[in-house]
Amino acid sequence: MGVRIPAEIFPPGEFLKDELEARGWTQVEFADIIGKDTRLVNEVISGKRSVTPETAILFSQAFGTGPEFWMNLESQYQLSKVRPTKDNVVRKAELHGRFPVREMVKRGWIEANKNIDILEQQLFSFFGISSINESPTISHAAKKTSYLEASITQIAWLCRARKVALSAPVEKYSEAKLEIALAELKAELQFVDGARKAGAILAKAGVHFVIVESLPGCKIDGACFWLNKNSPAIALSLRFDRIDNFWHTLFHELDHVKHKEGMTQPIIDVDITGADTADIPDIELRANQVAAELMISPKELESFIARVNPMFTDEQIIGFSRRLAIHPGIVVGQLQKRELIPYSFHRKHLVKIREYVTSTVLTDGFGNMVND
């Protein structure tokens, strides 16, 4: 008899049981026929014992089949038990290739789990998708500072920022409140720890403000999005721990809020101060300009530059900043951006402010984790 390949994978014992029933033989009778203990027959049928070459020959002689049939049944059954593991390896590799799994686990955004189904479900839930081939809805909408499509790592950061923002309590938003908030924020520009008050000021204005540490290679500065049509939210990464960068990025995102941008299409701002202006959309150029002007009056800055350039001494920078009631680091930052001084000059004024911000603003990262 030729070799038969079953359409479904069953243990050889299932076939042995069928053969015995077809012939009306008991396990005791069959054991006597092949000259083996009844225990061997019982264990093969129950799947506790594998079919060996010896038993395959005995079975084939008793049933008139080829020994290859029984060996093929055994080998296919054993392979079927291994295949799910191999499939899991492929699925796991696909998940790690598509999503920043390791970093998400490290940050506590999802839990580490050896069960591929649970890991997969966590990722699908996080990104709001139902299959690995589906793109997160937010990725089709998200606009970056550059025209390049947002990466999955950047989308992961944005998804987390949105989730964290939902936990940030705020008052009802209004444009009038935002204008008041901008004036109050400007009054804090002269203080090293002025950033500490940003969260409370924006909460009164109805703006959800959160900090989410960037993921490796993300290069995100901030984002503007709306939780609903009446709830604007901004998130900063604080990837540059400098007083000038914090205030510039904050005012940049608030300008998006003021213009109701990010309402239907979340805005991801990447390298907002370093990108080539030729690659930046008009709304980003405007937000950058507004942010710079909120910190220093263009007329005042141009007058200062005309008087002092190129001899920007420490005393002159400090005197100018005091007259405008802003921190010297903000002046240094704008002079560097205009390439009027090297980035190595006056760096002592570019003070760190991260600890002040994260002490009062809902923060995910930098040693803090927001519970879901």
Placement of each model-derived feature along the sequence:
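Active-site hotspot residues in diverse enzymes, especially metal/ion-binding acidic/histidine motifs
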Residues: G2-D372
